[in-house]
Amino acid sequence: MNYFPLSQQQQDWQQLAADIASRELGQRAQETDRTGTYPKDSLDALRREGLWGLRVSKEHGGLGADMLTTCLIVEELSKKCPSTAMCYKMHLEAAEIICRIPTTYQIEHFVEPMAKGEVFSTIAG
């Protein structure tokens, strides 16, 4: 049940995430969790599908997705592989922080490469 009316674009993103999760993440999830390994192959699948720059603004080559769309995508991924969804969400959070008020250096070395899928970002607590 959705409490927010979803645009067609949001529904399309949600379906794409569900398809990727079923096709790519589900088959690796049990092994990733059993061995406690980093879900590199699953994250690479998200990168190949163009989701790496989800929270990077369109101005800097990203998708410029809003928070609701982001939540829909992460929710679908987590249904098949919570580990991948968590790592991906950490990347998105760091990307959003860097993209808020980036310097020219950050745009060139982090933001634009993130949008292209060349850089993985994360945060530490």
Q: Which residues does each PLM region occupy?
A:
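Short, flexible segments with low predicted structural confidence
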Residues: L16-D19, E49
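Intrinsic disorder at enzyme termini
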Residues: M1-Q9
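Glycine-rich flavin
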Residues: Y38-R48, W52-G125
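N-terminal accessory segments
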Residues: Q9-W13, A17
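Short, contiguous strand/loop micro-motifs
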Residues: F4, R28-Q30, I97
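N-terminal capping segment at the start of a domain
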Residues: I20-Q30
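A generic secondary-structure micro-motif detector
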Residues: E31-D33, L63
